[in-house]
């Protein structure tokens, strides 16, 4: 979360699930919906979690104690990518991409994005 704050990132794109076929693929680095978690000097509140066909969108409120700032960050997580394979169709991934582009335009097209 420090990198998100330092780079003033407003959008995170994630293409993996935390677990696939019973194996851990990614560390869950965010709090559950409607919960707050502190990571070092950064407080993260998961304000909203919306499920779409093939992906999730989360809206976080981030507070940095060092930077004395508060910002809204969006995370898009594609959940239909099978382990060691490719999706059967790209329609959900293309749809998520459109949402990401729209989000970037709404918050300012020059905002950094982490993929």
Swiss-Prot record:
The keyword Hydrolase applies. It catalyses: O-phospho-L-tyrosyl-[protein] + H2O = L-tyrosyl-[protein] + phosphate. Residues 1-115 form the Tyrosine-protein phosphatase domain. GO terms for molecular function: protein tyrosine phosphatase activity. The keyword Hydrolase applies. Substrate binds at residue 83. Belongs to the protein-tyrosine phosphatase family. CDD domains: PTPc. Its EC number is 3.1.3.48. Keywords: Hydrolase, Protein phosphatase. This is Tyrosine-protein phosphatase 23. InterPro entries: Prot-tyrosine_phosphatase-like (IPR029021), Protein-Tyr_Phosphatase (IPR050348), PTP_cat (IPR000242). Pfam families: Y_phosphatase.
């Amino acid at each position: 979360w420090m990198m998100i704050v330092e780079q003033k990132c407003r959008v995170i794109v994630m293409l993996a699930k935390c677990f696939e076929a019973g194996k851990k693929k990614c560390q869950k680095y965010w709090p559950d919906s409607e919960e707050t978690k502190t990571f070092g000097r950064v407080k993260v509140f998961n304000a909203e979690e919306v499920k779409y066909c093939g992906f999730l969108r989360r809206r976080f409120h981030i507070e940095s104690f060092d930077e004395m700032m508060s910002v809204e960050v969006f995370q898009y997580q594609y959940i239909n990518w099978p382990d060691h394979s490719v999706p059967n169709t790209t329609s959900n991934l293309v749809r998520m991409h459109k949402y990401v582009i729209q989000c970037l335009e709404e918050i300012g097209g020059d905002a950094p994005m982490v993929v």
